[in-house]
Amino acid sequence: MSLRHFLTLSDFTKQELENLIKRASELRKMQHAGEIYQPFVGRTLGMIFEKSSTRTRISFETGMGQFGGNAIFLSPNDTQLGRGEPLEDSARVISSMVDIIMIRTFGHEKVETFAKYSSVPIINALTDEFHPCQLLADMQTYYEHRGSIENKIVTWVGDGNNMCASFMQAAHQFGFELRVAAPYGFEPDSALMERFSHCVSLVENVQDAAKDSNLIVTDVWASMGQESEQNTRARRFAPYQVTPSLLDKADPEVVFMHCLPAHRGEEISHDMLDDPRSVVWDEAENRLHAQKALMEFLLKDKIKLPA
C-alpha cells in the first residue's frame, strides 16, 4: 500500500471507513475480554500537540501502548516547532525517526504541509477546520448501539465548527441526512454547504431539526481560541441548548452524542449527559478503539496482522 494519510474523512473511501468502524468494534471487544494483541512492538507514534487535550492524548498514547508500541509526546515548548523551524523540515526529520505521526493543531494547512513532506502516515487529531478522528468514534458508537447509520437522520445543534464540518463529510461518506440548526452567522462554511448540499440542509428552528432524528449531536458554544467570544455566543446560542425535551421530538430510538468536554447548563442541560438516550461515555471510550483501528490500517504493510 502506498503512503496514506488521514487528514479528513474524504481521504478514505466509504468501504474503508465502514471497515474501520467494524474493526474498531472488534478491537473494543478484544480489549474488554482482556485479549493481548500487540502488532506494534518496536513501532513508535509521534504525537504533536499545539492544542491541549485530554481524550486525544490518552486515547492515542494508551492505544499505542496496548498495541505494544511507544508514543512520544511533542509540544512546541519541547521542540524546534516552537522556535520557528519550518514545518517541512520538522516533517522530514520527525518522520525519519518514527513510524506514524498524529497532529493536534490550529490551522488545517499545517497538517497538510506535514503530510506533504512526511515519509510516514499523518493523522489529523484535530484542526480548526476538521476533527475526523472524533467522527470515527461517533460512527462506531452509533453502529454499536443502533446498527447502520445509512439513510438515517442526524441533527447537528449549535456552531458550524470543525465537528460540524466533519459531520458534513460523514453524511456524504456514510449516506445519512444531516440537518444543521445553527444561529445566523454561525452556519457551516458556505463552500462545504454547497459541496454537500445533496445530504446537508440548514434548518432554522431547532425543534423542527430534531423531528424524527435518529442522532442528535452538539458541541461547546465557544471552541478553543474563542474564549473572548463566550458572552456573545452564550446569548446567541441560548435557544440551541440540547435537553431531554428536545430529544422527545426525535425518533423514539434517538441517541445523543457530544465529543466532550461539555459545559452543563450551556449547550446541554444539566441532566442531558445522564439521560438514558445519551451514549457519550461509550463515544468517549471509542476514541481509543477507533484510533487503534485507524493506526492498524495505516501501518498494515509494516505489521503482522492475524490470519
From Swiss-Prot:
Task: Report a single Gene Ontology molecular function.
Answer: amino acid binding
Residues binding L-ornithine: N162, D219, S223, M224
**Which reaction equations make up its catalytic activity?**
carbamoyl phosphate + L-ornithine = L-citrulline + phosphate + H(+)
Q: Name one GO cellular component term.
A: cytoplasm
Its GO biological process annotations read: arginine biosynthetic process via ornithine; citrulline biosynthetic process; L-arginine biosynthetic process
Pathway terms, separated by semicolons:
Amino-acid biosynthesis; L-arginine biosynthesis; L-arginine from L-ornithine and carbamoyl phosphate: step 1/3
Q: InterPro entries given for it?
A: Asp/Orn_carbamoyltranf_P-bd, Asp/Orn_carbamoylTrfase, Asp/Orn_carbamoylTrfase_sf, Asp_carbamoyltransf_Asp/Orn-bd, Orn/put_carbamltrans, OTCase_ArgI
Q: What class of enzyme is it?
A: transferase
Protein's cellular compartments: Cytoplasm
Disulfide linkages recorded for this protein, renumbered to the chain, are: none
Instruction: Identify the keywords attached in UniProt to this record, alphabetized.
Output: Amino-acid biosynthesis, Arginine biosynthesis, Cytoplasm, Transferase
Recorded superkingdom: Bacteria
| Record EC number | 2.1.3.3
Q: Which PROSITE patterns match?
A: CARBAMOYLTRANSFERASE
Q: What does this protein do?
A: Reversibly catalyzes the transfer of the carbamoyl group from carbamoyl phosphate (CP) to the N(epsilon) atom of ornithine (ORN) to produce L-citrulline.
Q: What is this protein called?
A: Ornithine carbamoyltransferase
